[in-house]
């Protein structure tokens, strides 16, 4: 049962169009970083409880995964050292403590942070595959709505 507890979260995060999926991924040689950020009130209470995530309109879940392979083709999940931080438009920053979550062969890195209504955040992620892959850095911007 616990093995499939993350499945509803993954379905939610993957319910995006192919164009959005390409916008939420970046290729670095033999590796692809997939990333997303969503308000935690999208999570079911069970998923939030299982992963110690507070459900709230004012909290955002950042998810990152690193795959070995080509963008648009199913790749092999790779463990990585992942760090991240956020910055709002007034340059207030917060370091995230990305924690690893494994579900079968899938490997994800997650953390949450607080936002206010209509706040735009820059999210900076650095990932280094433990199998010797390159250090990869991405930045994405997203506006969050809490009302």
Give names to the regions the model predicted.
Residues 60-70:
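Beta-strand-rich structural segments
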Residues 121-128:
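Short, aromatic- and glycine-rich surface loops/edge beta-strands on solvent-exposed regions
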